[in-house]
């Protein structure tokens, strides 16, 4: 079976995508998987070009992005460029036609937000992970919160604002900040609604910091969410499956930085993953059940990692967010949670491919 491994992308998480793709390629080539799967890598350059052939192999081998000036692949392998993004260009390369199932491991905007999932749906080929709806809801923090609210899942207080409210009228901005202070207080977190891996997020403790953070977040997205801060432990649960998903052992993240930011997430030694989390059994079961509820609430499929706040003082569990395309790097929580739950990395990747095929070809 030929697996189209799609990685890179134009988002700020390009390097994370490469790291994830390398780990997945290694898992698809390990043990029994080696005789089941043939990997066809496709690399999306930072400039938007889609490359097949030698270029993706080079990136997987080196672990480094191709330079902007690189012209290492022949013209016929330049599948799509930013000037001529047409389905005709997609239909011609033989490599695309040969793919039996796609494994998109593109993090961030244009990767896990439903856009690439829409293209793969149009191609009528199975692909790993959630479809357009689940991906879009899992990416947009505001829409996600609304879905959780509808499902009755407890979460921190939040307020949604737009770039226009922040930038368009200097008379309105102070009033907006007044409302945020009154409803959420300090500390609070300001986040772009549609960026992953904690990009553009600020923790604020004062009016000046709030104003600066809102202005900064507006540079990243036209929709911004502000969440009340909470003194809590950060715990995570992985979900695997389609219509009858399973929840993993619960893990905990501990870190010394102010919050779990981009650098902390992807720098070895900056954060510790404790699996299983040392929490009461009933709390662990509650988190697993809530993870499955969240998975259903956004119509996720295949895989997701669900993040929670555990307020130890009160025993309260609050849902933070769902990530429908979690990282697969060496430091990533998702594969580690399943490894501790009895599913090693190569078996996990195999299951995800099989789930993609099952979802594409439902049976009674």
Swiss-Prot record:
One cellular-component annotation, GO: cytosol
Q: Where in the cell is it found?
A: Cytoplasm
Q: What is its EC number?
A: 6.3.2.4
Could you tell me the superkingdom of the organism this chain comes from? Bacteria
Q: Which SUPFAM superfamilies match?
A: Glutathione synthetase ATP-binding domain-like, PreATP-grasp domain
Keywords carried by this UniProt record: ATP-binding, Cell shape, Cell wall biogenesis/degradation, Cytoplasm, Ligase, Magnesium, Manganese, Metal-binding, Nucleotide-binding, Peptidoglycan synthesis
* Binding site residues for Mg(2+) 1: 307, 321
Q: What is this protein called?
A: D-alanine--D-alanine ligase
Source organism = Nostoc sp. (strain PCC 7120 / SAG 25.82 / UTEX 2576)
Taxonomic lineage is: Bacteria, Bacillati, Cyanobacteriota, Cyanophyceae, Nostocales
* Gene this protein is translated from: ddl
